[in-house]
Amino acid sequence: MNGGRRVLILGATSGIAQAVARVYAAAGARLALVARSREHLASVAADLTVRGGEVVLQRAADLCDLARHRTLIAEAHQALEGLDVVLVAHGLLPDQEACQEDPRKAVASWDVNFTSAATLMEAAAERMVVAEDGVLGVVSSVAGERGRADNYVYGSAKAALTAYASGLGQRLRGTGVTVVTIKPGPVDTPMMVGRKLNPRLVADVDVVGRRIHRALERGERVVYVPGKWRWIMAVIRALPIRIFERLRF
């Protein structure tokens, strides 16, 4: 089913993006990869080639440069000769206290985690609607379900991204383009190094990658990864505010 799939991954050097790309590569997909670091991107591309993928485009770019978004999408579309799957997977986990002390850091994190991701989705959707086909996935987070004291700067961006993806998906209904919102919990990636996390709640990145791949191929509208987070977050959302405010987790 996946052989020859034309896949664009934005933020291709992130841990989650690499895990998804490995699954597509093993199925013989053709890949276009975009990320900030040219050196890291080359390393990722080499690994995917060994695994069976055909990397037809590598592009080092600052994804916060909004003016480049349509050009990046157009280059990938041309190199791949179409777009079957687009995955928007870049992001960062900012230091909450640093963002509280310096609002410029908070704004910079929102630019990465929300603004650039949202505008990339629009640029990709614009191209995919013409073909009347395709899956547009975006990596949001369970952190966007309810703001918590230790990561509400990050969580607020992901909440906005989730809402944006929901609205975009509704707008694209009937066009042949499906929007998939991906909501991981904590995942064992470099972004989580140094964070104080309950190890029982941290998911293996390859398990997450396989689940995201399946969601993209099925066109699932919303996917929690791992699935237990759907029920965990349902409980957290339902907590009365006075109880929620007393908790620290």
Report residues per predicted region.
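Conserved glycine-rich cofactor-binding loop
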Residues: 13-14
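Conserved glycine-rich Rossmann-like NAD(P)H-binding loop of the short-chain dehydrogenase/reductase
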Residues: 27-44
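Rossmann-fold cofactor-recognition segment
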Residues: 50-67
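Conserved mid-core segment of classical short-chain dehydrogenase/reductases
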Residues: 70, 85, 91-107, 150
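Active-site helix of classical SDR
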Residues: 121, 157
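Residue(s) in the substrate-gating loop at a strand-loop-helix junction
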Residues: 141
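C-terminal helical subdomain
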Residues: 181, 197-232
